[in-house]
Amino acid sequence: MKKILILIAAVTLSMASFAREYSHDKDILYKGAPDGYTEKMCRIDVAYEKGGEKRPVIIWFHGGGLTKGKRSTPEALQKNGAVIVGVGYRFVSEVSIPETLDDAAAAVAWTLKNIEKYGGDLSKIYLAGHSAGGYIVNMIGLNKEYLAKYDIDPDRQIAALVPYSGQVITHFAQRRKQGIPELTPPIDHLAPLYLVR
């Protein structure tokens, strides 16, 4: 029995040695705050491993229909050692979609300026997001104007866009604001499909 307990302890300890230990810096303001709402929403969290070689960086935009949701650094993304930047942004109930997209671009700019101190590799910057976050990723990655405002060229400085379930037509939040019927799929300057090159 004693040998079995020793074996179980050894296996458990060896498994723990393979578990990744992430540090977390939270609630970092990434954009000048002209008002209380911007100061509250334009914040990021960074999850990273200390020491070692430079690591890929995933800038993660949460979902929520552009009207709700919360920034996060998903645990599923922390399994391979990447630095994860979870971005909060202002919702379209309070600002326009272009202002929300500018928040996202400002978060990317903050990341490019600061991520090396977290072990991030500037040659491996990935923009990723789910649902509304996927829409944001497509819009700021395909419409160069958003990132260009911050002297960023997505063709040179972003390794890939990884949108999960992001809308590619004009976002439903914008269609609702304009009174466009739900089954009408407009493709205008606020649609990733309009920007495909």
Indicate where each model-derived feature is located.
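Short amphipathic alpha-helix adjacent to the substrate-entry channel of hydrolases
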Residues: 70-87
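Short beta-to-alpha linker loops that shape the active-site pocket of alpha/beta-hydrolase fold enzymes
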Residues: 64, 72, 88-95, 167
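Positively charged n-region of N-terminal signal peptides that target proteins for export
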Residues: 1-4
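Hydrophobic h-region of N-terminal signal peptides that target proteins for export
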Residues: 6-18
